[in-house]
Amino acid sequence: MHTRIKTMYLIHHSHTDIGTDLQEQVVYNHVNNIRQAMAIIQYGIEHNTPEKDFVWNCETYYCVECFLNAASADEKETFFELVRRGNIGLSGTYLNFNDLADRGALFRRTASMQKTCTEYGAPVTCAMNADINGISMGGRDALIENGISFLYTNIHTHHGMYPLYKNQRPYWWEAENGKRLLVWNGEHYNLGNALGLNSNTNVSFNPNEPFFQTDAENPDYLNNLHANLEHRLSAYEADGYPYDFAIASISGVSSDNAPPNPALIYNVNAFNARFGNE
């Protein structure tokens, strides 16, 4: 691959969207997503298969809270054991709010989240925000004051694009009291799906985007993925992107509230086996 960007970090998650279905159904899906992720990881650990390295990221704490309310004591212990092991990631974001949510409510939910997770030996230091362009200063302060030091954002490309026309950029967001939050201004929350990292999807979220192509003459999705990555990473460099890594969020399927997909780790391993020395 002819770019200096040699590492792509994948954030495998289920985008939390409580407006796409009955909220009871959305809650059921996310509780089940967590249980599925736990089963995938435990299978890998018990059988020493690639699934032992599977990582599932809970985009919002609301989903975790619903799971904990439904889980048995053993399930809770197993869940946080996998968090401590690094197989499950937690986010300090309660839900993907617009700026109508007030600071007091956000602070209370974030503090409650941090208290619960810390009691299980898994304090939260990162947060993820997806599909909502922008976050209020009250939301920023609620994160900072409750021990969150890093915020990873994913834009909604239908309602707006990248600030200052620059994507994949970090910046410090400083509060009035001088405390700071490191923010990564990321891409769309299904970038990995659009690139073709899941062999069952290669659909662009932006119809004007020239980078996502499928070679109809070549059914091998790994070659398509390689071409898509080359185009995308080259475009970053042409735009002055200074780092040797990039980040892509990816869902199990190209949908909101999607389940975990263990095929992803096999796809990544297959890609690295073929192209990892480039």
What spans do the regions from the language model cover?
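Catalytic-domain carbohydrate-binding cleft regions of carbohydrate-active enzymes
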Residues: 1-278
